[in-house]
């Protein structure tokens, strides 16, 4: 599955649908508790990162790597897993970390599946609100 083909859409859409549900369960079982915060910028401003950001990204990476071991993964907290695949997954484990820190439920997990650098499918998952949105850029 390293070729762009709309026939493969259900494989990726089903994966992301299940991942959204798994991420919400993961949040309530493992992360709905106190967390540690650090500053990614080290004295040149403030860009918070939490232990939850890192845990979410590790969880997402493990799910993607298990299902699509040859795909590239680009994550905000742990960088790039390069492969020769034309598929890449781009992860923002907690979009809205500042909202997460203060308890505002509007934060989300953002995941994009790209092919040759172009978006193919995207997931915006809101675990605290138990909602998610899946969208494609293809017809």
Regions found by a protein language model. Name each.
Residues 83-138:
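DPxDG-like acidic metal-binding loop motif
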């Amino acid at each position: 599955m390293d070729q762009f083909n709309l026939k493969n859409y259900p494989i990726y859409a089903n994966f992301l649908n299940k991942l959204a549900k798994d991420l919400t369960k993961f949040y309530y079982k493992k992360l709905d508790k106190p967390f540690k915060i650090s500053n990614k910028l080290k004295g040149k401003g403030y860009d918070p990162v939490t232990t939850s950001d890192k845990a979410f990204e590790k969880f997402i990476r493990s799910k993607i790597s298990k299902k699509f071991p040859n795909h590239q993964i680009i994550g905000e907290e742990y960088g790039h897993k390069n492969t020769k695949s034309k598929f890449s997954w781009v992860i923002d484990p907690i979009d809205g970390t500042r909202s997460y820190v203060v308890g505002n439920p509007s934060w989300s997990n953002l995941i994009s599946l790209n092919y040759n650098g172009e978006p193919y499918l995207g997931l915006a998952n809101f675990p605290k609100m138990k909602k998610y949105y899946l969208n494609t850029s293809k017809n």
